[in-house]
Amino acid sequence: MESAPAAPDPAASEPGSSGADAAAGSRETPLNQESARKSEPPAPVRRQSYSSTSRGISVTKKTHTSQIEIIPCKICGDKSSGIHYGVITCEGCKGFFRRSQQSNATYSCPRQKNCLIDRTSRNRCQHCRLQKCLAVGMSRDAVKFGRMSKKQRDSLYAEVQKHRMQQQQRDHQQQPGEAEPLTPTYNISANGLTELHDDLSNYIDGHTPEGSKADSAVSSFYLDIQPSPDQSGLDINGIKPEPICDYTPASGFFPYCSFTNGETSPTVSMAELEHLAQNISKSHLETCQYLREELQQITWQTFLQEEIENYQNKQREVMWQLCAIKITEAIQYVVEFAKRIDGFMELCQNDQIVLLKAGSLEVVFIRMCRAFDSQNNTVYFDGKYASPDVFKSLGCEDFISFVFEFGKSLCSMHLTEDEIALFSAFVLMSADRSWLQEKVKIEKLQQKIQLALQHVLQKNHREDGILTKLICKVSTLRALCGRHTEKLMAFKAIYPDIVRLHFPPLYKELFTSEFEPAMQIDG
């Protein structure tokens, strides 16, 4: 039986720690300085011998240590320091596992036992971090195995080579007259259309696409997010009868939700509204890339003029690929958010995919207001707060201006996390998307979400007309996403191979026209 949540993991780092586990008394932020990592030269790779130590298996020669370190920590993805307790890990995860074994600690998860563990969030949940350590094979018994077998050495050497090649591509400095390298390369087979259409449905189901299992460069774009467990929430059946909210079309409460087939608006209890609002808010907070408080604390960390010029001097295709990667990362969190919304997983798979293809970027733009600083007109991007000038090399200044104008406008509404969550869910569950099979079912779900949003706005004593202002943003969001598609298609017409080979599969699945026929419904 699990005990009460333990105190945060002591942050004292062992010698040689990468610095992701902060010093005692400090707090790790999710905003790592990627530029520091990019400056590290790729390590040479040679075959090496290994010996067992009291703490695990480590490289015998100090000069060979960096060969193992090129493989990231299997627990959190930070820079590794060797093989510890049978697994390649960083110093922080090695120390965490050692302390957990020495103290026989029992941790509890304050959420749903499926927390994402990476270098930015590993200290937030000790239970899930320990479970991941055990899942990848960390064990005190691993130190007893002695020398590695030839098969193990060959496998490790192959992995080192693969990561070295990837790092060389990432860290290679652009030479005069040479184009900055693009990485990774995605191999599209003759039937790639069907396979990539399957990527999104597999991702919704919580499975990593088969193609990405074979290539870690591809899988790096699919976050290690476990399938969402069943939502427990409130026990509606155990709640005493509450006042009934009977909202009808005549009352004007649903001016933004169309009714088809003679359907009437739902009759919803206050308890059900509270439950839905709590479910969506909780799902939102659990699937945000960054904590709002942490983002607000580093708004002063803007790009220097020299750094801005570095972005401006990037090749257009390189900057496009970087933005595609960042958008894809954000969308992965939106997919997980959708999966946790009560009712979404009960929709047919076709409708789940249609809603995500149509609405995921809209939700990304809504969430952007959390990372937008209206005072200096910057948004969090690639480790710091960026002005529109950072994106100049994309070649679409009008679109970037549109994005920043929307971010500033939504930010000026000062939405709470609950309000952002419910508005995001409302936008995502739009019943007017093309190719939906169960429009009425989605309509009813969206209507309930709108009621919950109205309920929260009233509880927060927001001014009259705030809901109308929010709903008016929907048309702006769609125009914004339409502009994104136009710019992408223009770029793709010039650089078709760049998009085909170097853009993340999920991004292409969502936004490029070559995948749209897969969504069509017969009849």
Curated annotation (Swiss-Prot):
List modified residues, type N6-methyllysine: 38
Question: NR C4-type zinc finger positions in the chain?
Answer: 73-93, 109-133
Expression (tissue specificity)? Widely expressed in a number of tissues. Expressed in both regulatory T-cells (Treg) and effector T-cells (Teff). Isoform 4: Highly expressed in the central nervous system, including in the cerebellum.
UniProt xrefs under Pfam families: Hormone_recep, zf-C4
Report the outcome of residue 330 to L.
Answer: About 80% loss of transcriptional activity
Q: Which portions of the chain have biased composition (kind: Low complexity)?
A: 1-26
Q: Where is this motif: AF-2?
A: 506-523
Explain what the record says happens when changing residue 323 to L.
Answer: About 60% loss of transcriptional activity
The record lists the effect of residue 335 to R as: Strongly decreases interaction with NCOA2 and MED1
The record's section on SMART domains has: HOLI, ZnF_C4
Keyword Nuclease listed? The answer is: no
Disordered: region residues: 1-63, 154-183
Query: Which effect does the record note for changing residue 371 to Q?
Result: Almost total loss of transcriptional activity
Family annotation (Gene3D superfamilies): Erythroid Transcription Factor GATA-1, subunit A (3.30.50.10), Retinoid X Receptor (1.10.565.10)
Q: Which InterPro entries match?
A: NHR-like_dom_sf (IPR035500), NR_DBD_ROR (IPR044101), Nucl_hrmn_rcpt_lig-bd (IPR000536), Nuclear_hrmn_rcpt (IPR001723), ROR_rcpt (IPR003079), Znf_hrmn_rcpt (IPR001628), Znf_NHR/GATA (IPR013088)
Q: What is the effect of changing residue 509 to K?
A: Abolishes transcriptional activity. Protects from protein degradation
Q: Which residues carry this modification: Phosphothreonine?
A: 183
Which disease is reported for it? Intellectual developmental disorder with or without epilepsy or cerebellar ataxia: An autosomal dominant neurodevelopmental disorder that manifests with variable features of mild-to-severe intellectual disability, developmental delay, autism spectrum disorder, cerebellar ataxia and epilepsy.
Query: What does its UniProt record remark on the domains?
Result: The AF-2 (activation function-2) motif is required for recruiting coregulators containing LXXLL motifs.
Official protein name in the record: Nuclear receptor ROR-alpha
Protein's organism: Homo sapiens (Human)
